[in-house]
Amino acid sequence: MQESIQLVIDSLPFLLKGAGYTLQLSIGGMFFGLLLGFILALMRLSPIWPVRWLARFYISIFRGTPLIAQLFMIYYGLPQFGIELDPIPSAMIGLSLNTAAYAAETLRAAISSIDKGQWEAAASIGMTPWQTMRRAILPQAARVALPPLSNSFISLVKDTSLAATIQVPELFRQAQLITSRTLEVFTMYLAASLIYWIMATVLSTLQNHFENQLNRQEREPK
């Protein structure tokens, strides 16, 4: 038992370094995924059916296939076409593309939940559709989308462990490498799992804080 604890202490710098990569991939994947997801959400709401169909096709592909397969096609498959990417950029692209598919549906549902009468009211005072979206619809939709998007981000933190399969030195990969040297399988994977749990707990606490702040603002008299 004492030896296992000492091993975890000795391995902690490597695990924390891996956790740093995990957070980088999570934040980057969520940021770029939200940007692309917003574009896809607008496409899903477009009155032009080919645009809607293209967005639905993209979302169907990335939600209907395993993330690990998407990562493999980017890292191992693209070199067949002369496109070679390092592990971290490959993981960032794969996570962003996958996140975008889920974020798009969340954002689309949030935008659609806003009363249609607000579009008419904004148009009646001379606001353009983009001004209406930016000033009236998006702030309200953001409140609706925050809880599911926060949950998606927490899931993304855990999903980054799949990047270990394409040699990204994130938290799970570091645990694998240490395990291969020490053969302490249970100890190292337990330590890695505890770090994932701590990160998820901190993020969940922040999510609850922001939601409470928003709810408090809504209850305050205008």
Swiss-Prot record:
Cellular localization per UniProt: Cell inner membrane
Known regulation of activity: The TcyJLN system is inhibited by L-cystine, L-cysteine, DL-2,6-diaminopimelic acid and L-cystathionine, and is stimulated by D-cysteine.
Tagged with keyword Membrane: yes
Consequences of knocking out this gene: Disruption of the gene decreases uptake of cystine. The tcyL-tcyP double mutant cannot grow in the minimal medium containing L-cystine as a sole sulfur source is completely resistant to both L-selenaproline and L-selenocystine.
Periplasmic compartment spans: 1-22, 86-182
Cytoplasmic side: 44-64, 204-222
Alphabetical GO biological process terms: cysteine transmembrane transport; diaminopimelate transport; L-cystine transport; sulfur utilization
Keywords: Amino-acid transport, Cell inner membrane, Cell membrane, Membrane, Transmembrane, Transmembrane helix, Transport
Principal localisation: membrane
Induction cue: Expression is induced by H(2)O(2).
Transmembrane segment boundaries: 23-43, 65-85, 183-203
ABC transmembrane type-1 domain ranges (all copies): 19-207
Family: Belongs to the binding-protein-dependent transport system permease family. HisMQ subfamily.
UniProt-recorded name of the protein: L-cystine transport system permease protein TcyL
